[in-house]
A protein has these predicted regions:
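Short, well-structured alpha-helical segments that form the helix of a local strand-helix-strand
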Residues: 114-125
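C-terminal, well-structured catalytic/ligand-binding subdomain of enzymes
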Residues: 1-60, 65-66, 76-109, 115, ...
């Protein structure tokens, strides 16, 4: 194709794994990039012991980015929000709970398009992991893309991340025709 999806890691050191999953049963096959330090594995050491290898079984559930066989790509980025610029999103409604990397796995497994990814995200209360706050860039094979971010109404009401709401920034002005509050990315 003629589409490129790129990102960088700002970590000084990381122990990275590329993970391929093909779960079947209506879910997409995908490749994802994993920072094994999220599983407690030292960035400066090889994965050698049986205990370390056992931990890597959880790798499919902590992706930082990836692409599925439908052409949906997703990356997670730090968003530096709240007190100290690192208050995790911790939305509290009656929706089911999901963590940041699990949301990315859900998108890779089930989304056929950016619209599907947004619809999936809207179904959950996000609880960011790793004592950080994140937003997501999602793109698909048609060239559509969006940024999914959870933001508070203002800085004075974002002390604990509980009041944040999903805000979607689309690259397609046609999708925004009924809204006066948008920007093109």
């Amino acid at each position: 194709g003629d589409r490129v999806f790129g990102r960088n890691y700002d970590f000084s050191a990381t122990n990275t794994a590329i993970v391929y999953t093909d779960p079947g049963e209506g879910r997409h096959a995908s490749y994802s990039t994993i920072d094994l330090s999220f599983l407690g594995l030292d960035a400066d050491k090889d994965v050698e012991t049986i205990g370390q290898k056992f931990l890597t079984l959880a790798a499919p559930y902590v992706p930082l980015d990836g692409i599925n066989d439908a052409g949906v790509a997703c990356g997670i980025f730090m968003s530096y929000q709240g007190e100290g610029k690192g208050t995790p999103t911790d939305t509290q409604t009656d929706r089911p709970d999901i963590t940041s990397t699990t949301l990315l796995r859900l998108i890779l497994d089930y989304a056929d398009s950016v619209e599907d990814a947004v619809a999936l995200a809207q179904q959950y209360d996000l609880h960011d992991s790793a004592s950080s706050c994140f937003h997501y860039m999602v793109a698909d094979s048609t060239g559509r893309s969006a940024i999914l971010e959870w933001v508070g109404t203002d800085a004075d009401h974002d002390a604990d991340g509980a009041q944040r709401q999903l805000n979607v920034l689309w690259n397609d002005t046609d999708a925004l025709s009924d809204s006066a509050d948008w920007q093109v990315v």
